[in-house]
C-alpha cells in the first residue's frame, strides 16, 4: 500500500474532523518519509486547508510504531468521512395533504401500507386503484421502490439513496451508525461505488481514489 495514500487518508480525516490521532499519524509519516509542507499542498491546493496542514509540521508528539497498511475499518472510515456533515432534505409534495399519516411502499404494482390513517388509505385508493394495483400484507422491499412518507421528519440515508421518496412535509436525511454499517456490507458495493463517484473537490477526489484502492476497483 503506497505510504502516500496513508498520508492522504489520515490528512483528509484530520482536515474534516480535526482528529488528533490522524494528525499524529500524518506528522509521523511525513517526518519518516521526508514529506514537506510544499509536497502536501500540491495535493490540497485550496488555501482553506493550508493553515491546518501547517499544523502537521508543528506537531511534536510522534508515533513510535506505525502500520503501513490500512486497518480493517478503513472502508467504514471512508464512508463516514464521505458522509461527514452530510446535509440533505426532501421537500414536500403539496399534492399530499398535511392530514395524511403513514408509510407506503410501491414497487411495480405491489403496495405495502404501514401505520396509515384513514385519510392516507382514502388517497391511495383514489390514486392507485385496486383494479390495477395489489395491496399486499407482505413487506415490499424498499430498494427500487416508490416510498410515500406522511407525517415523518426524518428518513435514513439508505432509504433515500435506494428509493424514490415523496413526502407531505420537509424530511431530513439521516446518516446513522446503523446506516453506515449497512452501506459497508458487500451486497451494497454498487451503492458505495455510486456514492464515491459523485462529488468534486480535493477531499472527495482523494477519498474516491482510496476507496477504489481499498476495494480493489479501478478509479474512473
Curated annotation (Swiss-Prot):
The signal sequence is none
The lineage's top-level taxon is Viruses
**Which Pfam family is one of those matched by this entry?**
Chordopox_G2
Q: Which UniProt keywords apply?
A: Early protein, Elongation factor, Protein biosynthesis
Q: Which cysteines are joined by disulfide bonds?
A: none
Question: What InterPro entries would the database entry show?
Answer: Chordopox_G2 (IPR008446)
Q: Spell out the family assignment given in the record's similarity comment.
A: Belongs to the orthopoxvirus OPG087 family.
On subunit structure and binding partners, the annotation says: Interacts with H5 and A18. Might be part of a transcription complex composed at least of OPG087, OPG145, and OPG110.
Question: What's its job?
Answer: Involved in postreplicative transcription elongation on intermediate and late genes.
**Any idea what this protein is called?**
Late transcription elongation factor OPG087
Source organism of this protein record: Variola virus (isolate Human/India/Ind3/1967)
Amino acid at each position: 500500500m503506497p505510504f502516500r495514500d496513508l498520508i492522504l487518508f489520515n490528512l483528509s480525516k484530520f482536515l474534516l474532523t480535526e482528529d488528533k490521532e490522524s494528525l499524529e499519524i500524518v506528522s509521523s509519516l511525513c517526518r519518516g518519509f521526508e514529506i514537506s509542507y510544499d509536497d502536501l499542498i500540491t495535493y490540497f491546493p485550496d488555501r482553506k486547508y493550508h493553515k491546518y496542514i501547517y499544523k502537521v509540521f508543528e506537531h511534536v508528539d510522534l508515533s513510535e510504531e506505525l502500520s503501513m497498511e490500512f486497518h480493517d475499518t478503513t472502508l467504514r472510515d471512508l464512508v463516514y468521512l464521505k458522509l461527514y456533515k452530510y446535509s440533505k432534505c426532501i421537500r414536500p409534495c403539496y399534492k399530499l395533504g398535511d392530514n395524511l399519516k403513514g408509510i407506503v411502499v410501491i414497487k411495480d404494482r405491489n403496495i405495502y401500507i404501514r401505520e396509515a390513517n384513514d385519510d392516507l388509505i382514502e388517497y391511495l385508493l383514489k390514486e392507485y386503484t385496486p383494479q390495477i394495483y395489489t395491496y399486499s400484507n407482505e413487506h415490499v422491499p424498499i430498494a427500487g421502490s416508490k416510498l410515500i412518507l406522511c407525517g415523518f421528519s426524518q428518513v435514513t440515508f439508505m432509504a433515500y439513496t435506494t428509493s424514490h421518496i415523496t413526502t407531505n412535509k420537509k424530511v431530513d436525511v439521516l446518516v446513522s451508525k446503523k446506516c453506515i454499517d449497512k452501506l459497508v456490507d458487500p451486497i451494497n458495493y454498487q451503492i458505495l461505488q455510486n456514492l464515491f463517484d459523485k462529488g468534486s473537490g480535493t477531499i472527495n477526489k482523494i477519498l474516491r481514489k482510496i476507496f477504489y484502492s481499498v476495494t480493489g476497483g479501478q478509479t474512473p
